[in-house]
Amino acid sequence: MADIMIQRLVLASNNPGKLREFGALLAPLGIEVVPQGDLGIPEAEEPHPTFVENAIAKARHASRLSGLPALADDSGICAEALDGEPGVCSARYAQKAGKPKTDAANNAHLISQLAGKLNRRAHYHCVLVLVRHPADPCPLIAEGTWTGEVVDAPRGAGGFGYDPHFMLPRLGKTAAELSAEEKNAISHRALALKELLARLQAAASNNGNGRPA
């Protein structure tokens, strides 16, 4: 599959958890992933209200500064009872309350905001954007959603972010209790990447020369 696809790209993220997951997901395809931090590229601003807009901005930023095709991820957890919060602010949710930008602080703030609410349904959402160059007029966009519930008590030592509090009722486990292999088969990020690869393969086939049009 890798022979009809981009073989080297810059990943527009400095998040260690995301870097691990993308490395594991893309390695079998023979795609070399270069973290933007290795190229001295700072993180892009994320001023937009939607995952799609932020992912596009991050991908163009990384491609412009690296000269490489770029893959960007914008993702977060959305709680029904909070009208979709933390949403695009998931990584910096606690900062809204004047607290540190850490996973522990973000989780504590989410639990405090859900206190007294019966509806604990939530979903992780991921948008992936691939640009072949900074001015790519037709970025490839894919999305994935992973549904679950927010639980007060953390469980598990794996994953990152809100995973210890993200319960998967069908499995009876939190995302943090899954092995890396289990998570990478069913997560929002895995689903989005599967869709992205299918779109990339279709674009290459339609163009007929092994490269997307």
Role assignments for model-derived ranges:
Residues A2-V10, P16-V34, D38-A213:
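Anionic-ligand binding patches
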